[in-house]
């Protein structure tokens, strides 16, 4: 499961992302505030189904112990929407469902790992292998060099942006595993 939070303050648009993610402050049920990178239905390439796939994959990653930022169900109120002055974001929020998906903002110090960063530690190598297996299992074709959705602080990774997981219609030759003989070649 994941916690519900309510958007209380718009900060800014994120610099990357086709789905037009935004950075907002949200309030937990207990009143604590948390910075959240949130996506809403109107900005999704893949309809609201992309947000559902993203939430499912994030919860599964969390349950498997993979390095995923804390996921949230983000609620937006008419008062929050009215407080947003950025016209593009205002348009996005007005045309979206009133619940979106969010991830706890990563702390400063996370960035893209490159070969020039030096050799990975054994711990990072193991995490990279686990993330690769997870992405292969969920058919995530969106984690690639030109899409920085796997970041590191040198000690651990953080994976996010799972909207393109579970999209079996994009996989040539994919067969539902519950059909007799579908896994015969494996």
What are these regions (language model features)?
Residues 163-166, 170-186:
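C-lobe/activation-segment region of protein kinase-like
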